[in-house]
Structures are given as C-alpha cells and as structure tokens.
C-alpha cells in the first residue's frame, strides 16, 4: 500500500476506524458467522497462534487430535500449505514458528489432549479483569503479554464475556504509550495536564509521564464516547478501543496505515483459503468491505 496519503488527526482517524469497523474488522466477521461454540473456540486458538483469519477458519474445521496435527504442520512449516507454499504467519505472531511453535503445540496437546476448544474456554472463563484473563493466557507456552491483551479483548468483544481494562495494563505496551506522548505534544484539542503542584506538564513528548498519558487517554475516551464499542455496541468506547486507535494512528502517521488497511489486507489474506475451506469462505463473506 502507498505511503503517500493524507494524514488525519487522531479525532478524524479514530472516527473513521470506528465508523467503518476497521478498528478490529475480524471481530465483526466472527459475530456475523455465528460459528458453533466449539468451532469458534478452535478458530480463536488457531488465530491466536497464527494471526491469519483464513488459516484459522480452515484449521477450525478439524476436531480433536486432528486439529493439533494440522496446527503442528503450520508450526513446522515443512509440509506445503493447502493453498500452496508456506503456512502463513501474521506479523504480530512472527515469533510463533519453528521449534518454539512446535513446543507450544506439544504443550497444548499435553494440557488439552483431544479437546483443543477447551483452551479458549479456559482463557475466557467468565471474563473478569484484564489481569485475570491475561494471567490464564500466559500459562501457555509462547503466549506472552501482547497476545494476552488480544485474547482479553476478544473475550470481551467476540465472546461477550465482560473484561475490565485499566490504563496501567493497556499502557505497558510501547506503541500506544508513545502515541499518547506524541498526542500531548502536538494535539491542541487535548487540554493542559495540570499537575498536583499546580504546574502544567510540558508539551514535550520526551518529558511526558504516565500520569499525563492517563490524562490523554481520558480525554480521548471522552471524545469518542459517542461511539459504541464494536461489534457488540453494548457500551461506549473505552480504554481498549482507544489503545487500538492510538496504535493505528501512530502507524498511520508513519505512512504504514492508509484508510481501510486492515479490512483490505485481512480480506486478501483470506481469499486463497476461501477456495479450500467453507468456513474460510464464510469468513471472507462476513468481513466488512471498503466503503466510500
């Protein structure tokens, strides 16, 4: 995708993400598909390992030990993928490969035997706090803090089991933190952060403190509260959606996120799988499309 595009303010860009569901388009697709619970849980496990919606759709069709056998083929990446060539891996899970990935699959087999769907069910529980969910996630080999955040978000938004997030948990990741620092420096719509001693926090991204990052986050939550959190629309936008907006806005400003980037790329990646999998075809059809 071209890097030559008009750069939007975070207010404009966030409104676009929320209005077009490019914030997390996969979430909407999964809700539309209405997969049986066990298959949805297998889909989630495959996605959390591989970060490819078409591939996860294909793998979700296998049950029991056969699911783990196919997941191990993806981990080893020796046998050709059903779509030809190598089994794809999303950039976000680029470290889930080789010997580490096969050891991850071995751990899952040892723990869940012939019931791969139990992994997502265990991680989800009944929801709870972000820290409770991510603690369960990180019991699993090669499931660290970042994928823990993603799992917690999908438990809340896809499975509909409420997870409460807090700023400290969200802003332990560098990209949203850096984006919030930049926002405080460059965005005149964000009011000054008045400190406890009555002074004003300096508008310098290098000097921004966690307290000022919290100030920025609260401002953005207030700004976007007119939007309901997709895809359920059951509550106003909150910190986890603001985290995603900040991450994608930073990428947008650096020339790496033109409008509709996720929708376009996820659909393109799913299309080859739609030719070999009915579930992948359903996933492709359920994905939101680019709108004008």
Swiss-Prot record:
It comes from the Viruses. It comes from Pseudomonas phage PaMx11. The keyword Plastid does not apply. Belongs to the thymidine aminotransferase family. InterPro entries: ADDT. It holds the Pfam family ADDT. One of its GO terms (molecular function) is transferase activity. This is Glycinyltransferase. The keyword Transferase applies. Coiled coil: none annotated. Transfers glycine to 5-phosphomethyl-2'-deoxyuridine (5-PmdU) to produce 5-Nalpha-glycinylthymidine (Nalpha-GlyT) on DNA as a step in the pathway leading to thymidine hypermodifications in the viral genome. As a final result of the pathway of hypermodification, 5-acetylaminomethyl-2'-deoxyuridine (5-AcNmdU) substitutes for a subset of thymidines in the viral DNA. These modifications probably prevent degradation of viral genome by the host restriction-modification antiviral defense system. One of its GO terms (biological process) is symbiont-mediated evasion of host restriction-modification system. Keywords: Host-virus interaction, Inhibition of host innate immune response by virus, Restriction-modification system evasion by virus, Transferase, Viral immunoevasion. It catalyses: 5-phosphomethyl-dUMP in DNA + glycine = 5-N(alpha)-glycyl-dTMP in DNA + phosphate.
